[in-house]
């Protein structure tokens, strides 16, 4: 749903005049609604790793400790990396991390290096120990702060600039969040709306993008690891 359609829908539900346009409007009420929707979207984007704002980045390794600014590697509004997703696709091996400050300093103070590469993000840089081999293809997933998509389908952003901008987060949650924020600004009772909203956010985060089945007995079911497999019964005993 576009930004314009969302605010028009909200106005109909709330009994407010329905605007013909939002972006660039000088109507104080319309300007406020756009600002509140942006506030809601930014806050909701920080609540979890929504699949709609999760992206993959690829990087060609260089033979130095610093691989460069993380925002230059993950270029679409980098917010944070998803742990344990960096892989060296050339060697088919994980890049371990992010490690803590303590582990990193222990690595730097060690007389030996390796054998596994480990990383952390410090000062906005992706740094790796030991120094990796150049020209390997690395890939990882990250969560973006850009929750808005332009009509061209390729430009992602954090703030609205056109009525045709669409939103990458659950529409009903954005609508519910806009409702309680608007009531708060108007000095109306918003406690129940906010409580319902929070419950729906938690429920949506639990289902967003699908979730793996957790096995308490450590059996993965359909994705067995390589190794020797022993049948659970019907053993041939001499």
Model-derived features with residue positions:
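Glycine-enriched, solvent-exposed interface loops adjoining structured elements
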Residues: 1-238
């Amino acid at each position: 749903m576009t930004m314009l359609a969302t605010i028009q829908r909200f106005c109909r539900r709330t009994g407010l005049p329905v605007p013909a346009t939002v972006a660039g409007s000088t109507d104080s009420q319309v300007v406020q609604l756009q600002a509140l929707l942006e506030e809601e979207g930014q806050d909701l984007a920080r609540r979890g790793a929504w699949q709609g704002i999760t992206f993959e980045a690829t990087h060609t390794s260089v033979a130095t400790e610093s691989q460069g600014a993380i925002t230059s590697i993950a270029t679409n509004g980098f917010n944070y990396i998803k742990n344990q997703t960096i892989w060296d696709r050339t060697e088919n091996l994980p890049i371990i991390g992010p490690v803590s400050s303590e582990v990193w300093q222990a690595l730097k103070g060690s007389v030996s290096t390796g054998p596994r590469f480990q990383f952390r993000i410090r000062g906005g840089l992706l740094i790796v120990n030991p120094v990796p081999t150049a020209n390997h293809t690395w890939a990882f997933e990250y969560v973006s702060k850009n929750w808005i998509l332009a009509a061209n389908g390729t430009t992602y952003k954090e703030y609205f600039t056109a009525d045709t901008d669409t939103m990458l987060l659950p529409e009903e949650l954005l609508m519910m969040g806009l409702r309680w924020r608007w009531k708060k600004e108007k000095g109306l009772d918003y406690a129940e709306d906010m409580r319902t909203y929070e419950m729906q956010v938690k429920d949506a985060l639990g289902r967003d993008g699908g979730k793996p089945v957790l096995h308490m007995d450590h059996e993965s079911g359909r994705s067995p690891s390589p190794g020797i497999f022993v049948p659970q019964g019907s053993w041939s005993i001499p």
